[in-house]
Amino acid sequence: MTAFDQIPIEYLLPQRPPFVFVDHLLHYDEAITRTSFRIPEQGVFVENGHFATGGLVEHMAQSSAARVGYIARYVLHIPVTIGYIGSVRKLRIFRHPVPGEVLETTVTFREKIFEIELTDVEVRCGDELIATASIKTAGSDKVIDEA
């Protein structure tokens, strides 16, 4: 069993700083994946004292990608590949978080058809639900650089 929070996120994601919006994988099972991300004081998508919509969407997509990366590396023992956002549907943002807040995100697996995967994503700050979406991602054959 892997201690999820000890896994360097770079092992699971193709993105590299400053474009990484997941700090830790908190949990994985076949149905649910959880991640966390502390909003930085400054950086990409921090605008006017808030984490912008684009950042929330990218965080949700990267949380979904962390699930796929974990499965590849630790379940199937194959190289992690680059994926792409196919669509974001039913996006609802209830509040934009501020620097210093920690996002805790739950990715619920819905279905996979060939290399297309559908997930539902919920983003929380503490007990407060701040964003939801359904995200469709597509896999590729391009392997990420080993971290």
Protein language model annotation of sequence segments:
Residues 6-16:
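Short aromatic-glycine motifs in intrinsically disordered, low-complexity regions
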Residues 34, 98-101, 108-147:
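HotDog/MaoC-like acyl-thioester-processing domains
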Residues 2-3, 68-104:
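Hydrophobic beta-strand-centered segment that forms part of the acyl-chain substrate-binding groove
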